[in-house]
């Protein structure tokens, strides 16, 4: 591994060789299992029932009691099971794909005319960090609302910064 010395930091070689490879085509899965703990904080609470038809982007679990994130369907299809995962007491929603990947017809672009509306849109989206803690993004941005910081610009850097990782 090559290291370059800098006065204030260590720079690892990026080694993102797979970035030059042909993209992998991923087909729609036949089933998804969405746990209610895909974020830090309280568990999300299912709002769908077995037998319900769901669409891509449809809200299927609301935020838990505190510091939580909602969960949305990632495929269209039928809810086949809501049960604890084998690893513990965390509920998961099982969805069998209908193969159509139909978007939720009720989805609309959020209206964001100020910081509060922006923060609410981020909260409702269920967006969380990709780090190990899956920290809810709205909680990070909440400092705008409570006055801890004055923020006039939010810059989203969606580029992967970790050496060797090209899949995020």
Q: What is the meaning of each model-derived region?
A:
Residues 165-168:
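Glycine-rich phosphate-binding "P-loop"
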Residues 1-163:
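Well-ordered secondary-structure scaffolds
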